[in-house]
Amino acid sequence: MAMRAEEADRPDLAYYEAVPYLLVIESVERHGQWLRRAEHPELPGCVVEAPSAVEALEELERERRRVLRRLWDGGGLIPVPRPPLRDSRSHPAT
């Protein structure tokens, strides 16, 4: 299948995975229990809740990768509010 011109210019998924998205963690009460809510507000729908901050961060990382993959596979726009920490196009992952 031929690649469209805009797809040829699109960075690979690793490029987007290296973007340092804002991270927000807060304590929230749900049904009499305190949970930690973690989110990347710049990525639509990238939010999780867990009993501890560590668990929330671990779950958020999995969710971030799912959201990026879903946007990537769907050809949607992926927010890039700041440059990646590393540019996978010039420094391939080992």
Model-flagged regions — what are they?
Residues M1-E26, V54-T94:
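Short, charged, surface-exposed hinge/linker loops at domain edges
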Residues E26-L43:
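Short aromatic-glycine-(Arg/Gly/Cys) micro-motifs in beta-strand/loop hairpins
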Residues L35, V48, E58:
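Short acidic, gly/pro-rich beta-turn/loop elements at beta-sheet edges
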